[in-house]
């Protein structure tokens, strides 16, 4: 039994669509046959930029599972939990005297059932029709008004067609917020089955246990000691470790010895003093109250050594301290249930943004470190921890860690902004694989290539896929000098033209604007290549570029190609006419757009001094660069990186910016137009 899906309807940033989170299955943190543990493959990831809605998922689970009680310390629903766009629509409806819908927040929890396993589903009995043997069960939770007529009358008095206007709709919004806040006592969380029948006397906390490890828990100088204390205390409670630690009888013996000494030394004198000042028969006895927890917390001190030198705890690295705090919380939770007991609950462990304080390498290895630590700490246990781990992050390194350690894109939920609302997209291998087959080389390439900046796609405002090394070197500089693009996170992913297609499905799922900058790769015959013939037209020409072929109706012919290709959020850019010629590479485009530019000429001369003199002549005629641009392309074929670095050096040391080739400029304009919407 496990949480399979979780839909949030009109809760905070989540509206009525694109609002479902998918979770990994119920295998939980279990040992394989070889005794190893792999948390990555059983971890659900919530990824996205800051303020996208990742924490909202945790807050919803926390309020649903842990907040449905009368305790003031428990998380409660408030007006701020309602989706603001939803409230605005309701205000407009009420302003037109339509009161059919009252403000509510809804959740749908899909519970997966493991066939053939001993799932104890007594808590789900009321949700299962008699004689029905389902693979999954849906629970509908609704936070709604109980006394609806009273609430409706209040709304009618404050917001109606006589009061509501375009000019005062903001005032009406605040009126509704006030009504909701004043009626929170009139709201109740109710549960329904798939047929809309209310299920009474049901508590979600009897079915689900949600344990949250919050971000940035390194708040004091003794956090590391507290983490170790927690681990040792948990291990001490386990029968496996009981004989190797201080037993209760040992501690009781110490308490008795202390009591005897205290009473012998002090109690008689104190009691004589009390008798002398009061008529009542009052005496006092000193009792020792030493416990294992008090010993660990207050008496035992940790000393840390590094290269035989003692290191104070407050000088220990914050990243490693944070990692140990997370591990200690996990172990503490795992020790909650004895090995012999059967846990009939769905156990959710939420880890919020664990990358806090961690350097990139530690983030990259985060999941493997968790694996190793838990495996060592639980190596003498036989228990299977029936838990699902949910991890939120805005670290591309942790995304890499999940994909590479788990070998899959499954259970990655991408959360992004969709206007003022959040948008959740659940990824999996079948959705991302170019042809739906996860065993083919293209998909294997994605999983391996994702470590080379591809995971930045999950956190970028836009992306540019480039053909080669020179573009990857120079485009970041061009972007940094663009006053619009330099305010956004534009990730540049180096990948050749053919392999750009591999990312097609993933890019469309993410829905960020993406430009693919590729070479037109015009086919030349042998004589044209040998004579360095310039291209002036693509009529009756073919290309060898697989990306262009794909978007050109599977045709290599350039005869009907008049403009760039666009497909949903993807646009493919390739070279067009530049100063009378059509370049066929990025380097040739740079030369044609800047044939008489001093910075470009200096870079050409530094890269290929003999060829430079041969082409421009004596005296120097810059026009020769333009008329021999393809020759330059051929001569630079083995020195593209050197040319790009020389050009970058010249631009940075002279604070110069060169003319962008037309197709690069068009690519930037496309990204800007999409980001402005």
Tell me the role of every PLM-derived stretch.
Residues 39-111:
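Membrane-embedded alpha-helical bundles of multi-pass transporters/translocases
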Residues 103-107, 134-139, 206-210, 345-346, ...:
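Short glycine-/polar-rich loops that comprise or flank the Walker A/P-loop
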Residues 6, 89-95, 122-127, 186-201, ...:
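Short alpha-helical segments and helix-capping/turn motifs at coil-helix boundaries
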Residues 207, 215-351, 376-381:
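Extended helical coiled-coil dimerization/tether regions that scaffold
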Residues 1-66, 303-304, 308-448, 452-453, ...:
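Switch/communication elements of ASCE P-loop NTPase nucleotide-binding domains
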Residues 415-677:
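Acidic, divalent-metal-binding catalytic cores of TOPRIM
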Residues 12, 113-117, 144-149, 217-220, ...:
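Conserved nucleotide-binding/hydrolysis micro-motifs of P-loop NTPases
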Residues 79-81, 86-102, 108-248, 437-441, ...:
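Glycine-rich phosphate-binding loops of NTPases
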């Amino acid at each position: 039994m496990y949480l399979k899906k979780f839909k949030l309807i009109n809760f905070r940033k989540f509206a009525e669509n694109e609002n479902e989170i998918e979770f990994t299955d119920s295998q939980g943190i279990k040992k394989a046959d070889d005794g190893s543990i792999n948390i990555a493959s059983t971890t659900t990831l919530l990824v996205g930029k800051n303020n996208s809605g990742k924490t909202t998922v945790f807050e919803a689970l926390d309020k649903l599972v842990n907040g449905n009680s009368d305790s003031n310390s428990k998380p409660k629903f408030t007006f701020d939990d309602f989706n603001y766009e939803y409230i605005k629509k309701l205000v407009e409806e009420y302003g037109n005297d339509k009161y059919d819908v009252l403000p509510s927040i809804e959740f749908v929890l899909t519970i997966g059932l493991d066939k053939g396993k001993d799932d104890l589903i007594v808590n789900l009995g009321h949700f299962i029709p008699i004689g029905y043997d389902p693979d999954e069960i849906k629970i509908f939770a609704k936070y709604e008004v109980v006394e609806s007529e009273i609430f409706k009358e209040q709304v009618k008095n404050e917001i109606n067609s006589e009061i509501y206007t375009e000019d005062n709709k903001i005032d009406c919004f605040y009126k509704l917020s006030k009504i909701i806040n004043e009626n929170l006592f009139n709201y109740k969380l109710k549960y329904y089955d798939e047929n809309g029948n209310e299920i009474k006397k049901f508590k979600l906390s009897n079915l689900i246990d949600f344990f949250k490890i919050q971000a940035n828990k390194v708040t004091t100088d003794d956090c590391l000691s507290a983490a170790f204390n927690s681990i040792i205390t948990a291990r001490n409670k386990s029968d496996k470790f009981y004989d190797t630690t201080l037993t209760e009888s040992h501690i009781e013996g110490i308490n008795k010895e202390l009591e005897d000494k205290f009473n012998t030394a002090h109690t008689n004198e104190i009691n004589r003093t009390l008798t002398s000042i009061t008529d009542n028969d009052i005496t006092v006895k000193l009792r020792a109250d030493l416990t294992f927890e008090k010993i660990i917390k207050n008496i035992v001190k940790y000393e840390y050594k590094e290269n035989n030198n003692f290191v104070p705890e407050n000088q220990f690295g914050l990243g490693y301290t944070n990692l140990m705090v997370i591990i200690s919380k996990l172990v503490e939770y795992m020790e909650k249930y004895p090995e012999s007991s059967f846990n009939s609950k769905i156990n959710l462990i939420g880890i919020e943004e664990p990358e806090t304080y961690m350097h990139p390498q530690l983030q990259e290895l985060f999941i493997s470190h968790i694996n190793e630590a838990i495996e060592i700490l639980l190596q003498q246990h036989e228990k299977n921890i029936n838990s699902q781990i949910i991890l939120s992050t805005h670290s591309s390194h942790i995304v890499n860690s999940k994909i590479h350690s788990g070998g899959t894109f499954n259970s990655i939920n991408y959360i992004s902004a969709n206007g003022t609302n959040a948008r959740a997209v659940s990824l999996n291998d079948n959705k991302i694989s170019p042809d739906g087959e996860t065993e083919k080389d293209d998909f294997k390439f994605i999983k391996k290539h994702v470590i080379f900046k591809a995971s930045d796609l999950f956190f970028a405002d836009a992306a540019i896929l480039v053909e080669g090394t020179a573009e990857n070197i120079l485009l970041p500089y061009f972007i940094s000098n663009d006053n619009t693009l330099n305010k956004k996170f534009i990730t540049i992913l180096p990948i050749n033209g053919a392999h750009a297609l591999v990312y097609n499905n993933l890019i469309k799922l993410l829905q960020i604007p993406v430009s693919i900058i590729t070479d037109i790769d015009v086919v030349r015959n042998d004589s044209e290549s040998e004579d360095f013939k310039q291209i002036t037209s693509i009529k009756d020409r073919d290309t060898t570029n697989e990306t262009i072929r794909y978007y050109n109706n599977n045709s290599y012919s350039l005869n009907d190609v008049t403009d760039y290709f666009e497909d949903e959020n993807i646009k493919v850019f390739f070279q067009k006419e530049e100063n009378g010629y059509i370049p066929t590479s990025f380097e040739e485009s740079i030369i044609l757009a800047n044939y008489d530019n001093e910075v470009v000429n200096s870079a050409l001369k530094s890269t290929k001094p003999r060829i430079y003199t041969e082409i421009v002549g004596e005296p120097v005629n810059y026009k020769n660069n333009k008329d021999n641009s393809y020759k330059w392309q051929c001569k630079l074929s083995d020195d593209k990186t050197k040319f790009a670095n020389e050009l970058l050096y010249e631009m940075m040391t002279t604070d110069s910016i060169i003319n962008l080739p037309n197709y690069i400029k068009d690519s930037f304009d496309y990204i800007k137009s999409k980001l402005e919407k």
